[in-house]
Amino acid sequence: VDNFRAAHEAVTSLTGRGHRSIALVSNAPAQGEQQYLISSVRERIDGYRAALHDAQIKISPNLIVLGGWDTKNLADQVRALCISPNRPTAFLATDSSVALVLLGVLREMDLSIPDDVSLICFDDADWTSAITPPLTVISQPVRDLATAATEDLIARLKGETSAPPKETLLPAVLIERGSVSGSSQGRGCIPNSRNVGD
């Protein structure tokens, strides 16, 4: 999957709606942990950065949240980001499990999607279209990926090819649903007063 292009398209759709403070949230290892990012996460971060650069938006390192596999740590980092001076008006989650953590934190802080903040996530998990509002997602061509891998494997097993493995980049598709609005419509990631100091 062309993760760079997919992330770039998602962030460009947000900047096109006026968002200037966009956070990327991932469950990849954080700074200080083993600094190993799988290629798909690295490509998504690179696409995010390139889209901000193309929109002439300064890249703010604190808007890239690498929470590691500990969901409590990830949630704590998102909470801290939501009360920081550089609060996001939109989030890009690198997968649907990260989106679930984001949804929990935003609900806990009494923030509404898309009224207060916008959210786009990678992966068109079944639940993403079943919630209210349904999430805007980056759908990966799972069937096409499986077909391409199977065809390559069968050709190798039959001895039809001795060429080195090839890399095939398949496009992902941005499916716009109800979780994105213009930044001027929302107040951003500002907790309601009843939750401040709780």
From Swiss-Prot:
Gene Ontology molecular function: any one: transcription cis-regulatory region binding
Record keywords: Membrane included? no
Q: Would I find Phosphoprotein among this entry's keywords?
A: no
Question: Entry's InterPro entries?
Answer: LacI/GalR-like_sensor, Peripla_BP_I
Please provide the record's keywords in A-Z order.
Answer: DNA-binding, Plasmid, Repressor, Transcription, Transcription regulation
CDD domains annotated for this entry?
A: PBP1_LacI_sugar_binding-like (cd06267)
Which pathway does this polypeptide act in? Opine metabolism; mannopine biosynthesis [regulation]
Q: Which PANTHER family does the record cross-reference, listed alphabetically?
A: HTH-TYPE TRANSCRIPTIONAL REPRESSOR PURR-RELATED, LACI-RELATED TRANSCRIPTIONAL REPRESSOR
Q: What is this protein for, i.e. what is its function?
A: Possible repressor for genes for mannityl-opine utilization and / or plasmid conjugative transfer.
List the protein's name.
Probable opine utilization operon repressor
Annotated organism of origin: Rhizobium rhizogenes (Agrobacterium rhizogenes)
